[in-house]
């Protein structure tokens, strides 16, 4: 890949991965506007590694304690500390895992068009706006297994390009009475196993197809996506602690209309 392609697409992935604005919409739009070829499977794996590193580093002060409580709860077969939060993340991952394995081929075949991405970007932007009006006070530590499964079902919708995984999970959490910060934190925690699964599947495909790649290019892509994703998460959390999701809703609507203009 050209160095400019690597920098731009890595920044796009890092900036949009955790914001409720649909990374897939941007990764379709940028190459389309610039006339660039598909970035390839190896690049996808690299930026997934980068964004995963970013979110793990963001939760560095709590993630090891959460994992400790989780594994101790397994050994003792009882709730320990904040183990329920980790169990909730695990259960929230199940719906997307099941639907992904069952319908991934169909989704790839029928929903990867620019028009579909444009329409879903607009529709679920409106959903985010409506959900933001229902904002509550629950934090991520108030999540139950039942609530996690509901949010997990919403996450399964993000298999459709343009929906936005972070956008739909935050929307579901807001509808269920979570605060903006609480919904974002739980959404980000949910992203860890999802990115691991997606990156793992892509890695398997990469190995099976014996695709050639340049290690320095992949390292650069991972680094740029990691740094940009971490900065965006920090800024996003600062923004929603002080104001509503409206700026992101407006951006989605503008983006969706722009995509319709390009692809219709």
UniProtKB/Swiss-Prot annotation:
It is found in: Cell inner membrane. The keyword Transmembrane helix applies. Pfam families: BacA. GO terms for biological process: cell wall organization; peptidoglycan biosynthetic process; regulation of cell shape; response to antibiotic. The chain crosses the membrane at residues 1-21, 39-59, 83-103, 113-133, 143-163, 181-201, 220-240, 244-264. It is an enzyme of class 3 (hydrolase). InterPro entries: UppP. Catalyzes the dephosphorylation of undecaprenyl diphosphate (UPP). Confers resistance to bacitracin. Belongs to the UppP family. Bacitracin is thought to be involved in the inhibition of peptidoglycan synthesis by sequestering undecaprenyl diphosphate, thereby reducing the pool of lipid carrier available. This is Undecaprenyl-diphosphatase. It comes from Campylobacter curvus (strain 525.92). The lineage of its organism: Bacteria, Pseudomonadati, Campylobacterota, Epsilonproteobacteria, Campylobacterales. The gene is uppP.
């Amino acid at each position: 890949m050209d160095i400019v392609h690597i920098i731009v697409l890595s920044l796009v992935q890092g900036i949009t991965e955790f914001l409720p604005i649909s990374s897939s919409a941007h990764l379709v739009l940028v190459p389309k506007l610039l006339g660039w070829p598909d970035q390839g499977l190896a690049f996808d794996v690299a930026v997934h590694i980068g964004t995963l590193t970013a979110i793990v580093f963001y939760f560095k002060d709590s993630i090891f304690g959460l994992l400790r409580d989780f594994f101790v709860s397994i050994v003792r077969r009882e709730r320990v500390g904040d183990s329920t939060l980790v169990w909730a993340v695990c259960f929230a991952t199940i719906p997307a895992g099941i639907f992904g394995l069952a319908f991934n081929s169909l989704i790839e075949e029928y929903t990867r068009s620019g028009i579909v991405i444009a329409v879903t970007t607009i529709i679920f932007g409106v959903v985010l706006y409506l959900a933001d009006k229902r904002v509550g006070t629950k934090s991520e530590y108030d999540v139950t297994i039942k609530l996690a499964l509901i949010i997990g079902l919403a996450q399964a919708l993000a298999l459709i390009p343009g929906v936005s995984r972070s956008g739909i999970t935050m929307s579901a959490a807001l509808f269920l009475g979570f605060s903006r910060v609480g919904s974002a934190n739980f959404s980000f925690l949910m992203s860890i196993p999802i990115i691991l699964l997606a990156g793992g599947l892509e890695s398997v495909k990469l190995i099976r197809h014996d695709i050639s790649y340049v290690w320095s290019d992949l390292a650069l892509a991972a680094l740029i996506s990691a740094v940009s994703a971490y900065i965006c998460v920090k800024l996003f959390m600062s923004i929603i602690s002080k104001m509503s999701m409206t700026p992101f809703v407006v951006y989605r609507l503008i983006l969706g209309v722009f995509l319709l203009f390009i692809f219709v």
